[in-house]
């Protein structure tokens, strides 16, 4: 509880200092220290901006390897957009419809007020969403499946399959084997998927729901289980900012 209160005071004082401090011309919109911590795990503003930029760069690299430039896509969805730190980096989007969705109403309200060029909507923690079937030809989801248990993960994979157009691309990040904290034997005993329920405290520092914890996958688990929902095009180890593994998927023709 003490560490929680100390963190809240830090949010308060940093927020006051930033409001009273000098304003930089043409500086990118940056959320409050509290929201930066929620989506980035740190209050440091430069790192927040840079990780968002690098994450989008990682996605662009994956698409380039598929010979699918960003201007080829008409409807793009950022599933679990948070404060839009990745989506905001899409610049060549005049002919593209950009959407960001998240279960966090606070971050969505911030995006709606501060970020332009995309539509941001709050969604329920449980699928389905209100979008029509096959609404998007590109969906990306950074640092979402890294925090869901297996049941929720499968529910949202099913929903992403419903939303993705045939031939569309889904790029989702996972905590791969290099990131795991458990011994490999423990992962094997758990069939390659571990949900680490280590943040279930009364005072949860990040302000996110209690079900939002830490999930770790092996590559073999993803290949065997996610192929029930999609055709797996590629699995790029450390493909997102040299940290998360990137799973590259497309919709099965039979669907």
Tell what function each PLM region has.
Residues 129-139:
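A short acidic, Gly/Pro-enriched loop at the edge of an enzyme's catalytic core
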Residues 80:
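Conserved S-adenosyl-L-methionine
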Residues 2-75, 83-128, 150, 155, ...:
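Class I (Rossmann-like) S-adenosyl-L-methionine-dependent methyltransferase catalytic domain
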Residues 138-151:
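A short SAM/SAH-binding and catalytic strip from SAM-dependent methyltransferases
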Residues 154-166:
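A short glycine-rich, Lys/Arg-flanked "PGG" loop and its adjoining helix->strand segment in the class I
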